Amino acid sequence: MLKTTGAFMMCLLLVSCSGTKLTGPGVKDGQLAPCPGSPNCVSTRAQDEKHRMDPIRYTGTKEQAHQRLVKVIASMPRTEIVTDQGDYVHVVFTSRLFRFRDDVEFVLDDAEKLIHFRSASRLGYSDLGVNRKRMEEIGKRFAKTTLP
């Protein structure tokens, strides 16, 4: 059992460290960068099912949605808000075990009352669904979060 676990962890490490680092995050021409071909990225702007997720819907003002989003992010472990410009928030999530860093970007679209996002691993090819699960969790927490 211990050998199997050790072998699995070694394979995970090798798969995660292979590949190239993603290009820098940010909004380009008003849009989040597209996901690469690898499965370690999800985005509300992706056209293919492998990478596509629905945006987070909100009611109220953009400022209230922003406050709720930041509150959710701050409640999650191993997070660092790198950039917070109101309409755009860039967060780095660090994994507990191997300290892998994932870039998550949010863009608030007040006209549509949507929060678009892109969540991508910096290294490797597969993330075993971590980015998708994280964004599903953020969406659930956002829906339950209220402001005082």
Where are the model-predicted features located?
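Classic N-terminal secretory signal peptides
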Residues: 8-11
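C-terminal motif of bacterial Sec signal peptides marking the signal peptidase cleavage site
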Residues: 13-16
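Ser/Thr-rich, low-complexity intrinsically disordered terminal regions
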Residues: 18-148
